[in-house]
Each structure stands twice: as C-alpha cells, then as structure tokens.
Amino acid sequence: GKTLAIDGLAARLNFVNKGQAWVVRRIEALLPVVQDAEARAMLEEMRRSHQANIAACEAALGELPAD
C-alpha cells in the first residue's frame, strides 16, 4: 500500500500516525450522535486503540537515530 511506498522508517511512522489521528478525529466527531450503547463502546475502544498506537509510534520515533 501507500505506507510501503514511503522511503524511510521515520517517514512511514509519521504517515501512519497521520492516518491514526484522522481516525481518532472522525470517531470523536461521531461519538456525540451515536445512540446505540454497543456501537458507542466499540467506537470508544477503537479510539483508545488508535490513541495507544499513536503514542507507540511517537515513542518509536523518539528512539530512532537522527538522520
């Protein structure tokens, strides 16, 4: 996919993080209008998972050697 076409690990992680952040924003926009408790719980868990992935990518980026 698009991620594999990006050269360099740091650039790939930044690209993935942008996508993860976009998903978090979309979920946060949807949550106020979701009435179904099960759907809401699933979206909240998905948001937490994406936020954890963002944090993990940021930590990995912080450990990469400088270019």
Where are the language model's segments positioned?
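Amphipathic alpha-helical coiled-coil segments
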Residues: N53-L64
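Acidic/histidine-rich alpha-helical segments that form the ligand environment
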Residues: G1-S49
